[in-house]
From Swiss-Prot:
It is found in: Cellular thylakoid membrane. It comes from Trichodesmium erythraeum (strain IMS101). The keyword Transmembrane applies. This is Photosystem II reaction center protein J. The keyword Secreted does not apply. One of its GO terms (cellular component) is photosystem II reaction center. Belongs to the PsbJ family. The chain crosses the membrane at residues 8-28. PSII is composed of 1 copy each of membrane proteins PsbA, PsbB, PsbC, PsbD, PsbE, PsbF, PsbH, PsbI, PsbJ, PsbK, PsbL, PsbM, PsbT, PsbX, PsbY, PsbZ, Psb30/Ycf12, peripheral proteins PsbO, CyanoQ (PsbQ), PsbU, PsbV and a large number of cofactors. It forms dimeric complexes. One of the components of the core complex of photosystem II (PSII). PSII is a light-driven water:plastoquinone oxidoreductase that uses light energy to abstract electrons from H(2)O, generating O(2) and a proton gradient subsequently used for ATP formation. It consists of a core antenna complex that captures photons, and an electron transfer chain that converts photonic excitation into a charge separation. It comes from the Bacteria. It is a single-pass membrane protein.
Amino acid sequence: MMSEPGRIPLWLVALVAGTGVLVVVGLFFYGSYVGVGSSL
């Protein structure tokens, strides 16, 4: 997979974006789960 120098590969952008989304969603569900658990 060749790309011109100075350009970020698309797969790297997708990987970082996907990881970021998973982390945000995971933190959201973890935070809501912990909040519900502590409120009970």
